[in-house]
Amino acid sequence: MDLVTLAGQLNAGTILPETILIVTLLVVLLADLIQGRQADRWTPYFAIVGLGGAIATMIPLWTQPATISFFGSFISDHLSLFFRGLIALSALGTILMSIRYVEQTGSSLGEFMTILLTATVGGMFIAGAQELVFIFVALETLSIASYLLTGYTKRDSRSNEAALKYLLIGAASSAIFLYGSSLLYGLSGGHTQLPAIAQALSSESLGLVVALVFVIAGISFKISAVPFHQWTPDVYEGAPTPVVAFLSVGSKAAGFALAIRFLTLAFPSVTDQWQLIFTVLAILSMILGNVVALAQTSMKRMLAYSSIGQAGFVMIGFVVGTEAGYASMLFYLLVYLFMNLGAFTCVILFSLRTGTDQISEYAGLYQKDPLLTLGLSLCLLSLGGIPPLAGFFGKIYLFWAGWQAGAYGLVLLGLLTSVISIYYYIRVVKMMVVKEPQEMSEAVRNYPEVSWSSFGLRPLQVGLVMTVIATSLAGILANPLFNLVNTAVWDVPQLANQPTVMEVAYQALSPAGKS
């Protein structure tokens, strides 16, 4: 094989965004090793530039047709670019909110940025992976980096406990996923590429269903679907808050990207079975997530159970399996990025100024910090689906797609649990705007004078303003976003029941195709 042929099969240009991030994290790591804490003044901003560059390089890739690279292991199409951009944006928002937070804990910013960028690269590779080994390596890159981030504030016993729980449960889920993948490898006769596996296993069998169950169990851990959610509340409460923000958006987006790619490519012969399983997961997640959130006293635990319920809403679009369903799923993940990052930015600001995340301590916040109260209120109301905020349009699109596909029960349950979620979101908003001085919490009474001059607070302010604006306007100005997600879905043939690029290539190279 000559170099020209090798270069053509590698198509390394498709991973230019990931390459930029790898170079960025290496520079940040070397700077931290050489300069130590002095590098903390500029490495976060260098990481922001690297993420911005990675996102910018996706724009020309968006105009190109679907391209297979690395001998069929990776595909760059509109769907993968959408999820890669979503994960990169979540990392960008996480960095903006983490500079002041990590600096205040006394930990190294350079090391934090390196691990966060590593997790981002792993998640972005998952979005386009189409080969079993490639998928598992990318998944473990994201997972191991996430474990390290969870326990990053090692002086905090809660962070250590959260990291240990996350590691143990995550290792078990990885083993389950790997076992399901190994079953696919054996049943298909040694194939590792997902389209080849689908062609080799074109009929339903008991072994294929068993493999499906194991694979779904591994994926469900990533998206915090009930009953694979046990790690979520404890990890969200104990981990550093910026890490929780990334796990709730970036890691969850990678999990849904893997679910779409893996299940639609490798399991077309058992579509009814995996749709039934995800229907059950959606029902359990919507009910448990939103009902248990009612009883929480910590903002981080409330948002943890909220994220479980939100995953249930997203699964409605996945279950119906139509173009509108997939598009509504992508649209909701996009608006969820802004409203959830905005909510966590507000939680970080409040905890930096008061040292607590208890819901009761937010009482009377409006009198001391109107901007923070407004931002948190808009983000929480958007998560609840109050019009005209972005979350309302996201849920309307999801429920409309489900209703159009005949999933009436799921849609009605989604509406009911959305009403439940509005109660616990509005409870926080109502507490913040109490007017009586005697109702003000002790933390708010001792609230420091609002200042943005300290190191790391200005990026936090930028992140807050950007997410709140996006949360407020994304629904009203939704047409460009609708076009974006529709293009991402239309470009993927397996979502429209057409032959995929990989399937066509495999058929052409197989002996049957040549004859």
Curated annotation (Swiss-Prot):
It comes from the Bacteria. This is NAD(P)H-quinone oxidoreductase subunit 2. The lineage of its organism: Bacteria, Bacillati, Cyanobacteriota, Cyanophyceae, Acaryochloridales. Keywords: Membrane, NAD, NADP, Plastoquinone, Quinone, Thylakoid, Translocase, Transmembrane, Transmembrane helix, Transport. The keyword Phosphoprotein does not apply. GO terms for molecular function: NADH dehydrogenase (ubiquinone) activity; quinone binding. Belongs to the complex I subunit 2 family. Its main location: membrane. GO terms for cellular component: plasma membrane-derived thylakoid membrane. It comes from Thermosynechococcus vestitus (strain NIES-2133 / IAM M-273 / BP-1). The chain crosses the membrane at residues 14-34, 42-62, 79-99, 109-128, 132-151, 167-187, 206-226, 240-260, 274-294, 302-322, 330-350, 374-394, 396-416, 462-482. GO terms for biological process: ATP synthesis coupled electron transport; photosynthesis, light reaction. It catalyses: a plastoquinone + NADH + (n+1) H(+)(in) = a plastoquinol + NAD(+) + n H(+)(out); a plastoquinone + NADPH + (n+1) H(+)(in) = a plastoquinol + NADP(+) + n H(+)(out). The gene is ndhB. Pfam families: Ndh2_N, Proton_antipo_M. The keyword Transport applies. It is found in: Cellular thylakoid membrane. It is a multi-pass membrane protein. InterPro entries: NADH-Q_OxRdtase_suN/2, ND/Mrp_TM, Ndh2_N. Its EC number is 7.1.1.-.
